[in-house]
Swiss-Prot record:
SUPFAM superfamilies: YktB/PF0168-like. Belongs to the UPF0637 family. The lineage of its organism: Bacteria, Bacillati, Bacillota, Bacilli, Bacillales. It comes from Lysinibacillus sphaericus (strain C3-41). Pfam families: DUF1054. Gene3D superfamilies: Protein of unknown function DUF1054. This is UPF0637 protein Bsph_1379. InterPro entries: UPF0637, UPF0637_domain_sf.
Amino acid sequence: MPKIKWTNKDFNVFKIDGLEQRMNALNDHVRPKFHQLGDDFATYFSSKLGEEFFPHVAKHARRTVNPPQDSWVAFAPYKRGYKSLPHFQIGLWHSHLFIVLAIIYEAPQKNVMAERLLAHPSLFEQLSDDFIVSGDHMSPEAISLEEAKEDKLKELLLRLRDVKKGEFLIGRHIPKDQATKLTASEFHQLTEQTFNSLLPFYNVIVGKDLK
């Protein structure tokens, strides 16, 4: 049964001053939920995509001064890491919950991945207008897919292809006020439905479905 219910306390972790204090709150309140989601959705991805997926809960281990502004659990078919691969994420900023598929600048084949997405524009027509896209995983900002279809979508994909720091994220952002009202069952259902919609994108990105 779904177990994860988000609260204001979870989101307010990212308003706590100080690295140690914020990390302690993150470890106490948020990371246990990410670990649970990691177990649940690693099984989901392994079943849906036909290879073993592993959860990676953000550790923020390199931080020595500035506290993290967001945190997440990522999913990829590699036990030792995820950043060099296209990967799925569930995470929080202080303002919203995010459920996304991401290609970040550390992916060595991101130019090829971008070309595959550019060659399949019809994929984006299959998503509802409440989906978002972004070109920066370190920013909470995003643009609605409906608005991006005019010209920003192609611009983001070309940047992913041509610019070393180019990135591409697609999925849903759920504002804090909405996320905290979701029951555990509603959140699980929304997350699974979002990922179901993103699976065809993943298959195209990794070259599994290039019809």
